[in-house]
């Protein structure tokens, strides 16, 4: 809840008056709340800098204070429930929109000068709400200046692609380049980029299963053989179905076969009756 203000704390200046419907109201401490239909469409005359007081209807009383700020006498006014735009905000938004639409410097100068005037008037008339209006005007100025000046765009640097083990080994096989044969038993499996010497070793196993242990015929060769077979058949009631798989599917099948071979028992077939064969 808002703290109560004693009447002794309110010390208005002699020129301070409250005018409502062309009648001067005594400032002994009164709050005007009106929501009648008769006040719709009527305007309230103001003198000097004006500020709206909290009300629930369309007709809002006006307070005229030439020199004394309103923030020292009363609490900040609540926002209008009908959502009507304030005079300062409407003037600042109109000036900001005009500055963003125009491209010439003269119109931008007019916008900045108009914004400064609205800031000073809101500071004298509304007291505490002057900072909000000035901040909104400053934000509008930053947006207009940022949109007008665009800096040069930097080109993206092209990164060197990583070395592919499979491509390098295939190129060396095509060129019949001899691979080095290590004298000792070496590791198998994953090959890092820094270990370039491991990529050029003469091995029968594939490095990280990237190279299959057998040669896969190309699609052109398979189609050529299928067409030749169809020509030699010379029948109309038969056909040849070509089934092909992807490289990653072939590699997965090779891994599955190797795992299956590793779980098989390598003992001789005629086992003694006293031995028991373990389950794989």
From Swiss-Prot:
Keywords: Early protein. It comes from Human cytomegalovirus (strain Towne) (HHV-5). Activates the E1.7 promoter. This activation is augmented by the IE1 protein. It down-regulates the transcription of genes under the control of the major IE promoter. Pfam families: Herpes_IE2_3. The lineage of its organism: Viruses, Duplodnaviria, Heunggongvirae, Peploviricota, Herviviricetes. One of its GO terms (biological process) is regulation of DNA-templated transcription. This is 30 kDa immediate-early protein 2. It comes from the Viruses. Residues 47-67, 90-101, 132-147 have a biased composition (Low complexity).
């Amino acid at each position: 809840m808002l703290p109560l203000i004693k009447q002794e704390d309110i010390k208005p200046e002699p020129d301070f008056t409250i005018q409502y419907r062309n009648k001067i109201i005594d400032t002994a401490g009164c709050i005007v709340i009106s929501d009648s239909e008769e006040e719709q469409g009527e305007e309230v005359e103001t003198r000097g800098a004006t500020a709206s007081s909290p009300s629930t209807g369309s007709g809002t009383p006006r307070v005229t204070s030439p020199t004394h700020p309103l923030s020292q006498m009363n609490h900040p006014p609540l926002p209008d429930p009908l959502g009507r735009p304030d005079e300062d905000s409407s003037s600042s938004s109109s000036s900001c929109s005009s500055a963003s639409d125009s491209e010439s410097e003269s119109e931008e100068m007019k916008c900045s000068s108009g914004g400064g005037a609205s800031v000073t008037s809101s500071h004298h008339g509304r007291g505490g709400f002057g900072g909000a209006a000035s901040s909104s005007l400053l934000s509008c100025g930053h947006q207009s200046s940022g949109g007008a000046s665009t800096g040069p765009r930097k080109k993206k640097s092209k990164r060197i692609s990583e070395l592919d083990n499979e491509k390098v080994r295939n190129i060396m096989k095509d060129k019949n380049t001899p691979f080095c044969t290590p004298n000792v038993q070496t590791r198998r499996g994953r090959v890092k980029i820094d270990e370039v010497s491991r990529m050029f070793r003469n091995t029968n196993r594939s490095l990280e299963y990237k190279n299959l242990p057998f040669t896969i015929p190309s699609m052109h060769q398979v189609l050529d053989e299928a067409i030749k077979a169809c020509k030699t058949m010379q029948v109309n009631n038969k056909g040849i179905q070509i089934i092909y798989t992807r490289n990653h599917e072939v590699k997965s099948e090779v891994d599955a076969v190797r795992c299956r071979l590793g779980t098989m028992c390598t003992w001789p077939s005629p086992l003694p009756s006293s031995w028991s064969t373990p389950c794989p």
